[in-house]
A protein has these predicted regions:
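C-terminal motif of bacterial Sec signal peptides marking the signal peptidase cleavage site
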Residues: 12-15
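Bacterial lipoprotein signal-peptidase II cleavage site
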Residues: 17-23
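Post-signal peptide N-terminal segment of mature Sec-exported envelope proteins
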Residues: 24-44
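Short, hydrophobic/aromatic-rich segments at coil-to-beta transitions
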Residues: 33-38, 63, 119-128
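Signature of long, low-cysteine stretches enriched in small and polar/charged residues
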Residues: 97-150
Length: 185
């Protein structure tokens, strides 16, 4: 009886042979379903396709819309401008690019990508902004005669570029699809 307690204690010490290692902190893994695109049509001078993950919300001005992505807490703000002449077009494009340049305070880089779809008369630039910028993507598209659409992608979360990267890449694909399917009426 007098040896039972020491023997049990010894057995407990010997039985604990598990190696303890520090486990890495888990990272959030953001995965989104493959998008299914549906047509957008209105009384405005354009049509395009957008993801079924987005909801269309009207803004206060006609032909201004918000594509709201509730799952990602993201929005694409679309603004349409009728163009009166070449100077008006140049001024609107300059305003769009000025808006991008104002983000250089927080952006670690700005990568412009021009696109040209002659068959549909869609021309423009997509800007990807890296770092802690308020916007992550900005674009404008025009037919260079009568129509211009400007768009910006915002996330309703603090700008933590690395954490948002999967969502930003998803939104970039959606914006590119919107641009590729954009048609003027």
């Amino acid at each position: 009886m007098k040896y039972i307690l020491p023997v049990l204690g010894l057995l407990m010490l010997i039985s604990c042979k598990e190696d303890y290692t520090i486990k890495p902190i888990g990272q959030v893994r953001l995965e989104y379903p493959k998008p299914v695109y549906k047509p957008f049509s209105s009384d405005c001078h354009f049509t395009f396709e957008y993801s079924d993950l987005a909801e269309i919300r009207d803004k206060e001005n006609p032909c201004w819309f918000i594509l709201h992505y509730p799952e990602m807490k993201a929005n694409i703000y679309l603004t349409y401008f009728p163009i009166t002449d070449r100077e008006d077009l140049a001024s609107k494009i300059k305003d769009s690019e000025k808006f991008v340049q104002e983000q250089t305070v927080k952006a670690s880089y700005i990568a412009p990508r021009e696109f040209v779809f002659d068959e549909k008369k869609v021309y423009g630039t997509l800007f990807e902004l890296g770092g802690e910028s308020a916007i992550n993507l900005q674009f404008h598209a025009t037919d260079s005669l009568k129509n211009l659409i400007s768009g910006s992608v915002y996330f309703s979360t603090p700008p933590q570029y690395d954490s948002l990267q999967p969502a930003i890449q998803y939104m970039k694909r959606d914006v590119m699809h919107l641009i590729e399917t954009l048609e003027w009426k």
